[in-house]
Swiss-Prot record:
DNA-dependent RNA polymerase catalyzes the transcription of DNA into RNA using the four ribonucleoside triphosphates as substrates. GO terms for biological process: DNA-templated transcription. Its EC number is 2.7.7.6. Belongs to the RNA polymerase alpha chain family. GO terms for cellular component: cytoplasm; DNA-directed RNA polymerase complex. This is DNA-directed RNA polymerase subunit alpha.
Length: 353
């Protein structure tokens, strides 16, 4: 099957992702991507927003059990709020949980006191992010003993769905909002490329509950879309990028064949990573890992690169951006690489230029 790589390689791609933090950068940030082909701002913005709000994993309280309370329409002596108000406040607790649930949490307080989320006795793998959230107020001599059940999930789950079949008397299920993303807004504007104004500028504002940073939330949503869309790609990159065969010309094709898109990409594979104009740190890491040609580099996965000593996320993003400008990426499979006469082929290619 012949694959025309121009379908995706010749589309205009953003130069980079600009981040603008607003106030608390761990909770709210704005991202700008430009230039995009006309229509891609709306396509990407709407898709990312829907995934951000619906599909990210998080933790939430699913039920509570209060001592001496049989149902949510009860009231407690010495507690200013009724149980319904307490449930509404508990729903706003932001939890960061490592591992799977469900987990049990305890909250005990004696009045007079303002009971906050920070008073919850959490284990080492559970962290309450909004510790100043007020749950209720206790008068002098009043006591509150509450057991909370927390679990992990995605999206929004109603209290009815959180009620176990064998729920004991006094167990009050709670609506669970698992999504760590609280608000997402996007805006699409015109932007200039040279003298042309027919391109999109996507501005995406993300606000989270603090359990995940806006930058990570955006990365997770993009990865979800990437994983879902992979089903629709019925060819692999090897069909578009043919590895240079032994004895082939510098372009990697047979003698007399016209140079197509695959041949142009083969030229990139034969270039040395020294020609990528990377930062000194990134270049040294590649050199220490014995990565000489771009063909060697693109076969490495992100995980393999991050295991390289002194190689961090900043260097990884730099390399991914450079490869993307050539229509390449990490984690590619190139059958027959490296060719036996790679040095001769690379030298011949260098002489041509």
């Amino acid at each position: 099957m012949a694959v025309n790589a121009k379908n995706w390689q010749e589309l205009k791609k953003p130069n980079g992702l600009e981040k603008k933090s607003g106030g608390d950068g761990k909770r709210k940030a704005t991202f700008v991507a430009e230039p995009l082909e006309r229509g891609f701002g709306l396509t990407l913005g709407n898709s990312l927003r829907r995934v951000l709000l619906s599909s990210l994993q998080g933790a939430a309280v699913t039920s509570i059990k209060i001592e001496n309370v049989l149902h949510e329409f009860s009231s407690l002596a010495g507690v200013r709020e009724d149980v319904t108000d307490i449930v509404l406040n508990v729903k706003q607790i932001a939890l960061k949980m490592q591992g799977d649930g469900p987990r049990r949490l305890q909250l005990s307080a004696t009045g007079p006191a303002e009971v906050t989320a920070g008073m919850i006795a959490a284990s080492g793998d559970i962290e309450v992010m909004n510790t100043d959230l007020v749950i209720c107020h206790l008068d002098d001599g009043a006591t509150l003993n509450m057991e909370l059940t927390a679990d992990v999930g995605k999206g929004y789950v109603t209290a009815a769905a959180n009620r176990p079949v064998d729920a004991p008397i006094g167990l009050i299920p709670v609506d669970a909002l698992y999504s760590p993303v609280r608000q997402v807004a996007y805006k699409v504007e015109n932007t200039r490329v040279g003298q042309e104004l027919d391109y999109d500028k996507l501005t995406l504002t993300i606000e989270t509950d603090g359990t995940v940073t806006p930058e990570d939330a955006l990365a997770y949503s993009a990865r979800i879309l990437q994983d879902q869309l992979q089903l629709f790609v019925h060819f692999d990159d090897g069909m578009a990028i043919s590895a240079p065969a032994a004895g082939a010309g510098a372009a990697g094709g047979a003698a007399g064949e016209p140079e197509g898109d695959a041949n142009q990409l083969n030229r990139y594979l034969l270039k040395k990573v020294d020609e990528l104009e990377l930062s000194v740190r990134s270049a040294n890491c590649l050199k220490n890992d014995n990565i000489i040609y771009i063909g060697d580099l693109v076969q490495k996965t992100e995980a393999e690169m991050l295991r390289t000593p002194n190689f961090g996320r900043k260097s990884l993003n730099e390399i991914k951006e450079v490869l993307a400008s050539m229509g390449l990426r990490l984690g590619m499979e190139i059958p027959g690489w490296p060719p036996e006469n790679i040095e001769e082929m690379a030298k011949k290619l260098e002489q041509e230029f």
